[in-house]
Amino acid sequence: MSQDNDTLMRDILGHELAAMRLQKLEQQRRLFEKKQRQKRQELLMVQANPDASPWLWRSCLREERLLGDRGLGNPFLRKKVSEAHLPSGIHSALGTVSCGGDGRGERGLPTPRTEAVFRNLGLQSPFLSWLPDNSDAELEEVSVENGSVSPPPFKQSPRIRRKGWQAHQRPGTRAEGESDSQDMGDAHKSPNMGPNPGMDGDCVYENLAFQKEEDLEKKREASESTGTNSSAAHNEELSKALKGEGGTDSDHMRHEASLAIRSPCPGLEEDMEAYVLRPALPGTMMQCYLTRDKHGVDKGLFPLYYLYLETSDSLQRFLLAGRKRRRSKTSNYLISLDPTHLSRDGDNFVGKVRSNVFSTKFTIFDNGVNPDREHLTRNTARIRQELGAVCYEPNVLGYLGPRKMTVILPGTNSQNQRINVQPLNEQESLLSRYQRGDKQGLLLLHNKTPSWDKENGVYTLNFHGRVTRASVKNFQIVDPKHQEHLVLQFGRVGPDTFTMDFCFPFSPLQAFSICLSSFN
């Protein structure tokens, strides 16, 4: 009997526990439904419209997406040209205009120009952390830093001599692009009036948009004409300041001239090899930035470097690419116009940088052949030219402080053209002539000595806001006779992003090669 009673008591307790669990679950479900009802009754809560048809809305979105990605409807897929060379008014294709039967047009959100250009070209916008330049002079510290990677630039088929370039918009100018797209959006907005009884609603909308677009083009032409006149006068003042003809504000104008005047860009059909070998125009400053790509298995030891030119229209245009050779006894960098085919056998190979065994002296060559191997090549091969040399020396403190740099360049003639130096043996090279003391026809430049900051205990250089991070790779090249006149400066602005500014007598290839030597 006792066993039967115990079994009965266990069954009763089990049923009671199950009933309690069911009651708790029911209570939780009621509380959850109550909270959901309270949320639906709030004023700011978005509620679904049962009368709307989701199928029609999804079909419209699908049609707009197909029209936007189709080659015939997208102007950027017709030719691989930069957005800056498209005719005016074609940027209106970046925003979608849908007109209904009642003649009212609704303009969708315009796609940013940078994203549109890179999406259609199959690219990724390179990461760049730009900081605003302050009016006060900024002092940068010298220390060692390492970081992440920047993606490579646009893709281009190898074995084709490059002429012109592709362009993408700088991240700092996004506000300008948004304002331009907003202006174009205002041009396509129809006024609050119905269509004429004798005309279709779509025709009325297009006519009004065309008239407003013409007015906008006239205003832009007038502003551009006034802007070119003012910029020409400003450039004239800056060029006078570079020559030392200024008055009381000549020092300020000289600094502004060293950073503000930019070299004109080549056209789409201009030979890029001749452009990168030609020295910059006197009185102009070419502002560039350099990115380093460490992605991949072997790029940690042999990274890729890409050089972009910053133009006056706030665009970055690809100039050169360089990489370190894998199977080489000394440090050897190959430089090409093609970012995807950096080989000596490629058609876009333009030069190389070679060092000695200790990586203290570097020589810059063009794409000619070695005179010792001339008999192994075809008879039409041209003997290589020496475009410059760089010597690194330790300072008084040994290797603890910044290095001393001496840049040796061939001289220029009266037409500001570089004198050809084609040595047939080692004794005729630029480094041998410099070591012998034969400096006739040579231009010697040195790096600016950093000042010691006692408070922070570091060496500092004034980069005027163009360099924002401390690094031992930061340097400035000056003329020994004019210490305040910068001809080349290089410094870090991101983990793998650097700025490079240079002027006459440097060419883009020479400046890029000197900066590559500092990475070794």
UniProtKB/Swiss-Prot annotation:
The keyword Flavoprotein does not apply. GO terms for cellular component: cilium; cytoplasm; extracellular region. One of its GO terms (molecular function) is protein-containing complex binding. Residues 224-233 have a biased composition (Polar residues). Pfam families: Tub (PF01167), Tub_N (PF16322). Disulfide bonds: none annotated. It comes from the Eukaryota. Strongly expressed in testis. Also expressed in retina. Expressed in cancer cell lines. Signal peptide: none annotated. The keyword Phosphoprotein applies. GO terms for biological process: protein localization to cilium; visual perception. InterPro entries: Tubby-like_C, Tubby_C, Tubby_C_CS, Tubby_N. Keywords: Cytoplasm, Phosphoprotein, Secreted. It is found in: Cytoplasm; Secreted. Residues 211-223 have a biased composition (Basic and acidic residues). Residues 141-236 are annotated as: Disordered. Gene3D superfamilies: Tubby Protein, Chain A. Belongs to the TUB family. This is Tubby-related protein 2. It comes from Homo sapiens. The gene is TULP2.
